[in-house]
Amino acid sequence: MQTSKIIYQENIKSKLMGNINYGGGMSSIFSSESVSEGHPDKLCDVISDSILDACLSLDPNARVAVETMVKGTEKKSFIFISGEITTSSEIEVDYEKIARIAAINVGYNDHDVGMDASSSELCEVTVKITKQSPDISQGVDLGKGLHEGHGAGDQGLMFGFACDETDSYLSLQEVLMPLPIALSQRLTLAMTEGIKSGLIQWGRPDSKSQVTIEYGSDGKPKRADTIVVAIQHLDMLDSFENEHEEHNFIESEITKKIVHNVIPHELIDENTRILVNGTGRFVKGGPYADAGLTG
């Protein structure tokens, strides 16, 4: 069973990495990305999830399919909520209030940051929610529809696997995820927690990361090839001579307080590249910089 498990994992990994032949002495690299809760797309996920949680708390049998879009402009930000929600009884859910609270909790309570969800003047919420289509619901309800015994509403394809390649690292044991995505997720989580705790006082909600891991010929993680971090920040030019000095400060802070506290030290060597805000400044962020969508 253990041998089959290893072969299965390596076959899956081989496909993801481009059919690398580990037995031929070749190494390979694999990259994974993660975004923080302040990223526009993830903000939409948070809002949709918050609405789902509210509906299920009132009706455990609720059927909820909610899509959210956010976008900011110079003068105003917008949250668009649409979808289909069906409950077993008439319940009242304040979708706008839920959306605003969710965005505020993420950190969007200042228009200069990307959105001020606390202000009805600076942030407009539009809600277009209907009940689930009867043509769809009859495919979900047992005893209804063309096949009365099915009770399935849709078709889909899913795949995935658990792996133990993180178990060699104390802080990542029993994660059961590939190392690149596990580290990427922990980088964005560390930045979010650092902002909320005050460790990174100049940080703003929108951030993302990407980790590239080099795998040896045996298919096991060997080293961190590249670590990329982007974090939205306060305009600090008043405190520095120029943008270059501002960037050096941000790079030093993130490398010291985030990267070296998240990435296991044995994965970092003299050839590991650490790139922080590689495009330069990242003051304008969130829904103002990019439209966000659920999913």
Regions found by a protein language model. Give the residues of each.
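Intrinsic-disorder-associated, low-complexity terminal segments enriched in Asp/Asn/His/Tyr and depleted
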Residues: Y8-N11, N19-N21
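N-terminal, positively charged regions that mediate nucleic acid binding
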Residues: N19-A65
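Glycine-rich, mobile lid/loop segments that gate access to catalytic sites or pores
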Residues: S31-V35, V70, E74-K76, I104-P287
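Active-site-surrounding "flap" and adjacent substrate/cofactor-binding loops of secreted or lumenal enzymes
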Residues: I85-A103
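Short glycine/threonine-rich loop-to-helix capping motif typified by GTGT followed
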Residues: S89-E90, R281-G295
